[in-house]
A protein has these predicted regions:
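N-terminal type II signal-anchor transmembrane helix
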Residues: 2-59, 119
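Short hydrophobic helices that act as membrane-entry/anchoring signals
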Residues: 5-9, 13-16, 86, 113, ...
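Terminal hydrophobic membrane-targeting helix
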Residues: 37-87
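Flexible, acidic/glycine-enriched loop-and-adjacent beta/alpha segments
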Residues: 50, 80-132, 189-194, 199
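Short, glycine-/polar-rich solvent-exposed loops and beta-turns at beta-strand/coil boundaries
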Residues: 50, 71-72, 104-109, 152-155, ...
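Solvent-exposed coil/turn segments that connect beta secondary-structure elements
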Residues: 61-64, 71-72, 84-87, 95-98, ...
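N-terminal periplasmic "start-of-domain" segments of outer-membrane beta-barrel proteins
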Residues: 64-76, 111-118, 154-155, 300-303
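Non-catalytic, structured segments within soluble enzyme domains
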Residues: 124-307
Length: 307
């Protein structure tokens, strides 16, 4: 064996050793996080029963919803998986997490691709590597941060939370939770509010092109917003990218995607707030009653309550 071959073998051995040490450090860190030794990990009870803030709905005697009241400017209304259009589910999985059905919260293949393409090759189209479950974990338990180092430190915690969520929930429940949590702007938090706000529809009635618009917004609800950016080509380009992802996943043919890509984005915008809907004066009166402090006897004369 020549000196050159010996040197090559040594380099290979050191590279494999370094590779093994990196993975050992990653798995050791994940184990430490899962045991609660590093970082904050929500208790099991909170993972099994996430705290959700939904709008309070005002329902008439015949069961008709005549309005809603939302806290902090949101208008989230829960919708079950069975009431979500298959077009929306297919578009979401194809675009955000193509291996959603096969992974357990962390897509190591997608993560490796993102590291190589984005981190090493500096390609903008490398993808983020985050699964739908990881994104849900971030929405539920990881407040947004503008600090890059802080975001990177939170990633391993999000991985562990995602793996635990996969243990406690079915894939259908995770899809439903994700779509119920996402903020589509204009007080449209959750897919039910978003479907009505942007298209005047219920989630189960969304067409392929409408579903693609909403899924496209999941990357950035401001940049790819068809109302906020109505004069920008970005929402249309993003929608068409979703079509191409659906082709790769086998949900659309090239001909179908090409035909859909020629369509303009047509919205039916309805910004939702508590003033819209049936009987606004009655609902406002009811809201004031519900928000009022509990009466105290000391605030009234005896003749006012002793009857």
């Amino acid at each position: 064996m020549t000196d050159i071959n010996r040197m090559k073998n040594k380099i290979k051995a050191w590279l494999w050793l370094g590779f093994a040490l990196v993975w050992l450090a990653i798995f050791s860190g994940l184990f430490a996080i899962s045991m609660g030794w590093i970082g904050y990990l929500p208790p099991i009870e909170q993972l099994q029963n996430p705290i959700d803030k939904y709008a309070s709905q005002l329902i008439a005697a015949d069961g008709e919803i005549i309005g809603s009241f939302a806290h902090s400017g949101t208008n989230r209304v829960f919708v079950e998986y069975k009431d979500i259009s298959p077009n929306l589910i297919k578009a979401l999985v194809a675009t955000e997490d193509i291996r959603f059905e096969s992974h357990s919260g962390i897509d190591f293949r997608g993560l490796a691709r993102a590291v190589v393409k984005t981190g090493i090759l500096q390609q903008k189209s490398g993808g983020g590597g985050s699964t739908i479950t990881q994104q849900l974990a971030k929405m539920l338990y990881s407040p947004p941060s503008s600090n890059f180092f802080t975001r990177m430190m939170k990633k391993p915690v999000e991985w562990v939370i995602a793996a635990k969520l996969e243990r406690y929930y079915t894939k259908e429940e995770i899809i439903s939770m994700y779509l119920n949590q996402f903020d589509f702007l204009y007080n449209a938090v959750g897919i039910k509010s978003a479907a009505y706000t942007y298209f005047g529809k219920t989630p189960d009635a969304l067409s392929v092109e409408e579903a693609a618009v909403l899924v496209g917004m999941c990357k950035n609800p401001s940049v790819y917003n068809p109302v906020l950016r109505r004069n920008s080509p970005l929402p249309l380009e993003r929608r068409n990218t979703v079509f191409q992802q659906m082709v790769k996943a086998g949900y659309l043919t090239e001909a179908e995607a090409d035909s859909l890509s020629r369509l303009p984005i047509t919205t039916s915008f309805h910004k939702m707030d508590h003033k819209q809907g049936t009987a606004p004066y009655f609902r406002e009166h009811l809201r004031k009653i519900m928000m009022a402090d509990k009466p105290e006897r000391g605030d009234y004369a005896s003749w006012q309550y002793d009857r």
